[in-house]
Amino acid sequence: HIKPFIETAPYLIVIFKKPYDIVDGKRIPNYYVNESVGIASGFLIAALQNAGLATLTHTPSPMNFLHEILERPENERAFLLLPVGFAKPQTKVPNISRKAPFEVMTQYF
């Protein structure tokens, strides 16, 4: 499938996860890898948007080619691809506002 945003974005951020470390030739598992990398990716996306940049998440399948062409160690796996740049002038970015606290919470006294 052709994804023009991959070719036109001025920056591509590839986020890798590290499911295990290698210490003295032994695999040592890292716990909650997907959760940790997912949360960190969310912080990065929020910061990019706060800086006025546009991005979207892309998870090509398979992603092994990223591991190979970027020459990453065997214990790293591509997690997410973020094309980053300024939105084109004709792009319609949704004007999303937060709900007021009383709309989403219940207080108990």
Where are these regions (language model features)?
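Short hydrophobic alpha-helices that are characteristic scaffold elements of the AMP-binding
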Residues: 46-50
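Short, electropositive alpha-helical surface patch
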Residues: 66-80
